[in-house]
Amino acid sequence: MAVSRRELIAYGTAGALTALATGRNTIAEGPLQDSSAPSPMPAQVASDRVPNLSASRNSSYDIRNDLKPRRLTMAMWDQAYVMRHMPGGSYENYDRVLDETVERGYNTVRIDPMPQFIDLGKPDRELRWADPRQPFMPWGANKAVNGPAGLWIIDFIEKLHKRSSLYYTLSGWWSMPGPPGSPRVPELLRKPTNMMEGAEIWATLLTDWKKRFGFDRIVYVDVANEMPYFFPEFVDRLKKATGVGFDDLSSLSAAQISFLADEINKAMGLLRRDFPELRFTTSIHGDLRWLDVPLELDCLDVHFYADADPRWTERTRFNEFIGDKLFQTDRWFAEFSERSKKTAAAVAPMLRSRQRFKMAEFADWALRRGTPLTTSESWSTWYYIDDPKLDWGWLLDWAKWSVDDAIDYKFWGWTPHNYVQPQFANWTDAKWHRTLNDRFLNS
C-alpha cells in the first residue's frame, strides 16, 4: 500500500507511515521499469509522447486578451490563510499580508474555503484542529487551531475586496479525518463518496458565498486539487472500477480514461448548470497521460514538478527522503540540499528542456480544448522549507527561468514556486517577487 501525497498533506503522517515501507516505484519513460528508489507517493509520470503537431499552435487568437485580468500572478495559500491566522501566525494580520501581496505584484491568491468543514450560514461555529505534530510542515497548520474559522474567512474576503487589484481562486484540498491515532480535525459537514457529491457540497458553499460576497473577484473554482490524489478515496475507487491503479501504467487504459472523464465532467456539468457565471476546473499534475482524457474544463491549472523527471529524483534521492518521516524530521535535509545543488549544476538545462516540452504539450491541449492555461504551484521540488540545512539558491534560479517559459507558452497564470506565503523567508524579498511578477504581467 502506497501512502498518497493527499493523505500525508491532508492529515499528516501519523498513523500512515507504516505504509511507506512498500512504496510504489516511480513510473519512468517508456515501458514500466524497476527503480532502485521506490517512491512512497504518487509521482508525476515521466513518459514521453509523440509530439502533437496540430494546427492549433498557429492560431492567431489569444484567449487571454478577452479575460480579466489578462494575466494572473498567483500565490498558493491553501488553508494557511485560516490555519495560521491564530495569534503569532503568519496570517494573523490580514490587512498587512494583503498589502504585502499587492506590493509584491501578485493579483490572485489561491485559497481553500474548506467546504467539507465551513458552513457560511453558521460562521461563528467553533472549529478545532489538534496540533498536527509536524514541525517541518511548510504550509497549512503548524500548531493547534481553535476558533470561528467561518468568521475568519469572511473577514479575509471582505478585506481582500477592499483591494481593487486582488482576485482569488477557490480550491478544494478535501482534507479528511485520518486513521486512528491521527490528530483530530473538525466534524465533517458531509463526506463525498464521488465527484458528483463533491460538486453538491461545493454548490452549498457557493450559494452562501454568492449571498455574502458575490462572485466578481473569483477567477475560477478548482473543485479538487491535483486529481486524483487529494479527493477522498478517489484513487481507491478508480482502481476498484478499472482493475488498475492510476500510477500503474505508462498510458491510461480505456477504462481509466472513461472513469476519469465521467466522474469529472459530470461534476463540472452540475456546477456549470447551477452557477453559469463561474468557471470550474480540477487541477492536475503535469502528467502527459491526462492529454488522453476528454475533460470539459473552463480553465486548466497544471502543476509541473521536478519529480516527473527520473534524472532529478535519482540524483536527489527525493522519493526516498520524503518517505522518511516527511514533515517530522530534518535528518535528510543537508544531503537533499547538497544533492539538489549538484543536480542543478550538472543538468539544469536538460531538466528545463524536458519541462518546457511538457508545457508545450499542455499549452496545445489547452488551446484545442478552449481553456486558458495556468500553474498555481510548480517547477522544482514540491517540498522545501526554511531551514539552515536547505539552500534555496538553486530553487530560486529555477523560479526565475520559469517566468520566461510561461511567457513563451502563453500561460494565463503563473507562480514562481509553491512557497509564496508570508511565513517563508523568500517572502521578505519584495523586490525579487515584484521583478518576476512585473515581467509576467507585462508580457
Task: Describe each region flagged by the PLM.
Residues Y94-E103, I111-P177, L252-E277, W401-S402:
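Aromatic-lined substrate-binding rim segments of carbohydrate-active enzymes
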Residues L170-P179, A203-A254:
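Active-site groove signature of glycoside hydrolases
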